[in-house]
């Protein structure tokens, strides 16, 4: 029958069109640090809501141990970094002569110090002479060190105890240190369902000192050679992340369910984190907050984390 033949032709046309769309999708692998980490937050939302496909991409998110993640990116084995901190994964590598770029920011910096509820530590200066557990090699610690210095604390007066980042929450619970320096999502995991800890403010010093709300910290990093060859793809990657960020803000319960399942964290923990001001989900092109990034570099240099100020080409500008 003619109508059957026509119907079959329509179905075939649709199938070919859909197949063509998928065939044109650009495949990218995005390595991230292992869960629970901020770098692993966006992948579950992007994939579940197909924000990559909507932008002509087929993204694969791969979690790697911290040492492997950093080694593979520094060696150029990985062209992109989904847990790219502005300092550890871009500026520090530039300091060492590697040509890498910060494409766009996803999360601004947030950190704190936690002490037991009954502790006599009330402000950051009270840490003098105390034992502080922290993950010293991370990008979080030098920025905390800088903020603590602004708050009047000489870190040389503190007994530092180094710990792997995964060991900080158990360290806080055990009471083996007077205080523990944390960031998200570890802080939310620690305080969920209890009132055993207090947070010591250090974040207010950033705006007081610099005048900026933005505090560039973690986003997408890339090898410059990859950037040069894939400039048409980069706006699509940004758009996929932008859609995910908007979704998290407008659909927090659905987003929390997706993220919690993938990260292996209790859903109420993620719900509370999204509702708080601590997540600091703030998406922007690296060049959009150049002045704030320069303040980050100056801060890192002042505490000895960076040897020199990186050139402005470290911050990707989509207009160039």
What are these regions (language model features)?
Residues 24-164, 171, 178-184, 200:
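Short, glycine-/small- and polar/acidic-enriched structural segments
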Residues 53-54, 204-213, 280-288:
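Short, solvent-exposed loop/beta-turn-alpha elements that line the ligand-binding surface or hinge
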Residues 227-302:
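Secondary-structure end/capping motifs
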């Amino acid at each position: 029958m003619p109508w059957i033949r026509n119907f079959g032709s329509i179905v075939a046309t649709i199938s070919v069109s859909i197949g063509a769309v998928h065939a044109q999708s650009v495949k990218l692998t995005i390595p991230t640090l292992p869960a629970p980490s901020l770098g692993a937050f966006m992948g579950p939302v992007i994939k579940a809501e197909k924000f990559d496909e909507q932008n002509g991409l087929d993204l694969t998110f791969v979690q790697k141990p911290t040492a492997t993640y950093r080694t593979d990116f520094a060696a150029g084995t990985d062209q992109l970094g989904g847990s790219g901190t502005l300092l550890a994964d871009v500026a520090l590598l530039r300091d060492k002569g590697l040509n890498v770029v910060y494409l766009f920011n996803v999360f601004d910096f947030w950190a704190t110090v936690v002490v037991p509820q009954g502790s006599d530590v009330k402000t950051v200066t009270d840490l003098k002479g105390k034992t502080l557990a922290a993950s010293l090699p991370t990008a979080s610690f030098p920025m905390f060190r800088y903020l603590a210095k602004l708050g009047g604390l000489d870190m040389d007066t503190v007994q530092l105890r180094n710990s792997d980042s995964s060991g900080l929450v158990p360290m806080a619970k055990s009471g083996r240190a007077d205080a523990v320096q944390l960031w998200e999502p570890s802080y939310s995991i620690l305080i969920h369902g209890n009132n055993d800890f207090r947070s010591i403010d250090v974040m207010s010093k950033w705006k007081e000192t610099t005048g900026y709300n933005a505090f560039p910290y973690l986003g997408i990093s890339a090898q410059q050679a990859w950037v040069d060859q894939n400039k048409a793809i980069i706006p699509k990657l940004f758009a996929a992340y932008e859609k995910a960020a908007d979704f998290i803000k407008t659909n927090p319960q659905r987003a929390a369910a997706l993220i919690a399942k993938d990260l292996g964290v209790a859903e109420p923990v993620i719900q509370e984190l999204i509702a708080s001001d601590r997540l600091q989900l703030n998406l922007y092109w690296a060049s959009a907050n150049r002045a704030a990034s320069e303040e980050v570099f100056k801060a890192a240099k002042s505490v000895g984390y960076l040897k020199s100020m990186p050139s402005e080409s470290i911050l990707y500008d989509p207009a160039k």
